[in-house]
Swiss-Prot record:
GO cellular component assignments: extracellular region
Keyword Secreted listed: yes
Organism: Faecalibacterium duncaniae (strain DSM 17677 / JCM 31915 / A2-165) (Faecalibacterium prausnitzii)
Additional notes on this entry: Crohn disease is an inflammatory bowel disease. This commensal, butyrate-producing bacterium, isolated from a human fecal sample, is reduced in some patients suffering from Crohn disease. In a mouse model of diabetes mellitus there is a significantly reduced population of Faecalibacterium.
Protein name (record): Microbial anti-inflammatory molecule
Length: 135
């Protein structure tokens, strides 16, 4: 069978490039599709959430439970928990007004920290060490 002069046999993912350019996601997908399974993607996403949550965990605890159990809690401090939690970044610096990106990333970090508290057991000092009583 004779093919037209402008016809060539190429793969479908290359045809995307001919028709207007391959995008980055298609290129990564073509390379990683044989390697990454659904389990790999799930593990990767879980690990990212865990890393972000670990970064925000201590500051989230300090700005919520730490305020309540500090020993010198006032109602004003309790009322400011939300402002301090969502208005300051993980380093404790205030987030600039109208900086939606930082507010959103801060909220996602706090959500990841709460997720970590919900899915993994915390270290129990009493369980892992010997507690001695002296009389």
């Amino acid at each position: 069978m004779m093919m037209p002069a402008n016809y060539s046999v190429i793969a479908e993912n290359e045809m995307t490039y001919v028709n207007g350019g391959a995008n980055f996601i298609d290129a990564i997908g073509a390379v990683t599709a044989p390697i990454w399974t659904l389990d790999n993607v799930k593990t990767f996403n879980t690990n990212i959430v865990t890393l972000v949550g670990n970064t925000f965990l201590q500051s989230t605890i300090n700005r919520t439970i730490g305020v309540l159990f500090s020993g010198n809690t006032t109602w004003k401090e309790v009322g400011n928990i939300g402002k301090n939690l969502f208005g300051t970044n993980v380093k404790g610096n205030p987030i600039e007004k109208n900086n939606f990106g930082d507010y959103a990333m801060n909220a996602l970090g706090i959500a990841a920290a709460v997720y970590n508290l919900g899915v993994a057991p915390t270290k129990n000092t009493v369980k892992e060490t010997e507690v001695k009583f002296t009389v």
